[in-house]
């Protein structure tokens, strides 16, 4: 997702490529413009605006606005309309393309999350898409971060024409990322949650929340 990694990924594309998915990360102002020129995304997905690299920005609003530069020329942007910072930055950005919002609070959002139910190691999400499709999908995760990431994924997939049935099948087949909330059995009845892939205040909070949700 860096100034080096993104160009290397773009070079892997050829005439047989139908879809390419890039993560674009920044650590200071001015970096996103370079990534935008390289990626030139058709669809932009805003995941979360955390505390990583916050020391290089005057405010979290500034960082969010910097990230939104990536989507200036994108045809579609998918975002969480419940996030006040993201919603405010979207309005300030002057973006004129198609906006696809997901929300747990606004029934008028393109993807409205009606209900989220956690059962042991599984999460069931009930949703309405474009006020007409009512369906459900299952996730093999229970942590809040993974569940919320699935909302953006679902909104994008449904927008691209994936059926609710296909979405449910693929969501249920997702696998954990290595070193991200990995549960390992320790000695003498101890349980270890390995979240060493990356760590900041936000990810630590997610790990503690995940630990408190576990049935054991």
Q: Where do the PLM segments sit?
A:
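Switch II (G3) loop of P-loop NTPases
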Residues: 17-32, 192-198
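Inter-motif core of Ras-like GTPase G domains
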Residues: 34-49, 216
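Active-site phosphate/ATP/adenylate-binding loop shared across adenylate-forming ligases
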Residues: 1-16
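Active-site phosphate/pyrophosphate- and oxyanion-stabilizing loops and adjacent acidic/basic residues
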Residues: 8, 33, 68, 209
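Solvent-exposed polar/charged
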Residues: 37-38, 72, 91, 213
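Short beta-strand-centered segment that lines the nucleotide-binding/catalytic pocket of NTP-utilizing
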Residues: 1-5, 24-25, 48-49
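Acidic, Mg2+-coordinating active-site environments of NTP-dependent enzymes
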Residues: 43-191
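Active-site beta-alpha connecting loops in nucleotide-dependent enzymes
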Residues: 177-179, 196-216
